[in-house]
């Protein structure tokens, strides 16, 4: 029976007393931080709604006007290898073309498929620029149905490797799997992103047709400046590494000291490595920021290498100028106008309701007490007044 009443040892005492789970007596831990809790009333809500509508309306209109000034040409050449003629230029089906110019286009874009002695195919695009376009001119490729934002895909590279460090095979980031090694050699650069790099080749000259002069383009400074610092020249020996599987067409005999890619200066690679957030995206490949594009007829030659049929997507050639917020994008301006319209609509509804069906008790003047009411209140709460009398 004695064991039933045996007590355990008490917690050790300290100078501050026994151990306690009480939170520290601070404003944050005790939830005493200062806060602002505004009282929503017609006098405060209506001006706010009207203010937002007045601000968002001109912003939305400005964004739409800026977007409409952007001139662009988009040609989907995904089916050039199957639908284009190999003998003469033919009109491209209308569903593969989209353009916005200040002047009317008289001649429809055309395409033709060519093949050299090595079996390499090229898609030749001819198109008309109906009016002079002021600088700057940008050439993008557009990909659809490609989910670069997949978690495994986004993480599939080795940070130290792209910084130029000669990482050993066993030390490579596991996220590079299954593109880590082949034939007991390290894949450089490893990972799914590098392996799936877009490799259609655009000519760096818009060849003028008839009396139109050639228009030169460049692939310099097409990547973000911060990206150019992320990629460094590798310290690997060419004999210790192999290219990714999908690069074998470009490097059929593997790497040598002469053809080893320098990702520090290879800006097309840097552009591709910055993954897109949506399955439809544009990536810059060429540009000219020094000269305007004269009106006339031009030809762009594209060497076909990228197999979009593997993921059921499309690839397009995009020639465009830029506006205040980039390319031709009406969505942002429309969203601003929608918000402005909703604010104006709710403001009108609240105003009409306030006029025809006011809420009297919502007036703040009812929170003030005059002297007579204070005296009555003090009388009711006198010391000798019982609870029964108050009720």
UniProtKB/Swiss-Prot annotation:
PANTHER family: CDC50, ISOFORM A, CELL CYCLE CONTROL PROTEIN 50. It comes from Saccharomyces cerevisiae (strain ATCC 204508 / S288c). GO terms for cellular component: Cdc50p-Drs2p complex; cytosol; endoplasmic reticulum; Golgi apparatus; late endosome membrane; phospholipid-translocating ATPase complex; plasma membrane; trans-Golgi network. The gene is CDC50. Changing residue 80 to A: Reduces interaction with DRS2. Coiled coil: none annotated. Changing residue 71 to H: Abnormal endocytic recycling, but interaction with DRS2 appears normal. Keywords: Disulfide bond, Endosome, Glycoprotein, Golgi apparatus, Membrane, Transmembrane, Transmembrane helix. The keyword Transmembrane helix applies. This is Phospholipid-transporting ATPase accessory subunit CDC50. Residues 68-329 are annotated as: Confers specificity for binding DRS2. It is a multi-pass membrane protein.
